[in-house]
Amino acid sequence: MSKLALLVLEDGTVFRGVSIGADGVSVGEVVFNTSMTGYQEILTDPSYSQQIVTLTYPHIGNTGTNSEDEESSSIHAQGLVIRDLPLIASNFRNEQSLSDYLKSQNIVGIADIDTRKLTRILREKGAQNGCIVAGNNLDEALALAKAKEFPGLKGMDLAKEVTTKEAYQWKQGSWTLESGLPEAKDDSELPYHVVAYDFGAKRNILRMLVDRGCRLTVVPAETSAEEVLALNPDGVFLSNGPGDPEPCTYAIEATKVFLEKGLPIFGICLGHQILALASGAQTVKMKFGHHGANHPVKDLERNVVMITSQNHGFAADEATLPENLRATHVSLFDGSLQGIHRTDKPAFSFQGHPEASPGPHDAAPLFDHFIELIKKHSA
């Protein structure tokens, strides 16, 4: 017999379902993601730290899980909410069922609830704090109290919590259907030395940089600009990550130094927001954020529309852009800023996820633009 579970939102709404993960209590900001596939990549994306993820697609878990699709070394989401967990996981790459995967990492999950109703609540009221309780003691009052006690992500610096503890080299390229994950490339195949700040970096971002000839030195979030400059990089990459960008003063100040030095800079997600803050713009907390793999974004410079992968709850405020920042991309869902480019420095950033994983690859040429800036700077 399945164990029961409940999800309680801070507004008092209660959802009862069945447990699909570990027993226990988990608290976080409840968000919804509209991706139809890629649940393992979503769960292991460090950007979901302190968030409970609701997947709007009704059937989740069909293909199981495997060690190659992880975007980090562990699950970072606080919990998982789905409509239906299939009885059987069927895929030639399957190594472990989704339920067993959650249990193995002590992550709570709940299924058999009305995820459409939950999503409508989050859209209308905004992202809410919530608490999942799974197991034998389903105490609604306790869950509600814990949801209300959660401080929320505004003002929360999570990048330094999920970052690597020590610097390391990354030389592995992208997975292919024919051969799986490749061996690390030789330095002779990687002409560009890029220092990548790990604010919660996804592995597929690193792989796509390696595919384009980058030898990566991945450094902790609080690494000083002086330490990075001592490595003599050809460019600096600012990764994705969780939480509020404003408290990341260490990263903002370091980025200011790189801008002054004229180093090529590319930022994604949190890295995009950090570049904006370092350039004098401001950021805002969004009502319910963008989380999904089907978000249309307009490229203002090429006048084309891209379908993109998105995962962010904060955004750079276009109204605060200084004269040396040019808006390059906007969301066609709500008009929010999606990309910027410094007019006076070789620096640019994108709010969405051009590496996808999961999602489309329409924005992948942004990685090529970074390489072009590095080549021009090195010439």
Swiss-Prot record:
InterPro entries: Anth_synth/Amidotransfase (IPR050472), CarbamoylP_synth_ssu (IPR006274), CarbamoylP_synth_ssu_N (IPR002474), CarbP_synth_ssu_N_sf (IPR036480), Class_I_gatase-like (IPR029062), CPSase_GATase1 (IPR035686), GATASE (IPR017926). Its EC number is 6.3.5.5. L-glutamine binds at residues 47, 241, 243, 270, 273, 311, 313-314. It catalyses: hydrogencarbonate + L-glutamine + 2 ATP + H2O = carbamoyl phosphate + L-glutamate + 2 ADP + phosphate + 2 H(+). Pfam families: CPSase_sm_chain (PF00988), GATase (PF00117). The keyword Nucleotide-binding applies. Residues 1-189 are annotated as: CPSase. The active site is at residues 269, 353, 355. The keyword rRNA-binding does not apply. GO terms for biological process: 'de novo' pyrimidine nucleobase biosynthetic process; 'de novo' UMP biosynthetic process; glutamine metabolic process; L-arginine biosynthetic process. Residues 193-379 form the Glutamine amidotransferase type-1 domain. Keywords: Amino-acid biosynthesis, Arginine biosynthesis, ATP-binding, Glutamine amidotransferase, Ligase, Nucleotide-binding, Pyrimidine biosynthesis. Pathway: Amino-acid biosynthesis; L-arginine biosynthesis; carbamoyl phosphate from bicarbonate: step 1/1; Pyrimidine metabolism; UMP biosynthesis via de novo pathway; (S)-dihydroorotate from bicarbonate: step 1/3. GO terms for molecular function: ATP binding; carbamoyl-phosphate synthase (glutamine-hydrolyzing) activity; glutaminase activity. Belongs to the CarA family. Composed of two chains; the small (or glutamine) chain promotes the hydrolysis of glutamine to ammonia, which is used by the large (or ammonia) chain to synthesize carbamoyl phosphate. Tetramer of heterodimers (alpha,beta)4. HAMAP family: CPSase_S_chain (MF_01209). Small subunit of the glutamine-dependent carbamoyl phosphate synthetase (CPSase). CPSase catalyzes the formation of carbamoyl phosphate from the ammonia moiety of glutamine, carbonate, and phosphate donated by ATP, constituting the first step of 2 biosynthetic pathways, one leading to arginine and/or urea and the other to pyrimidine nucleotides. The small subunit (glutamine amidotransferase) binds and cleaves glutamine to supply the large subunit with the substrate ammonia. This is Carbamoyl phosphate synthase small chain. It comes from Vibrio parahaemolyticus serotype O3:K6 (strain RIMD 2210633).
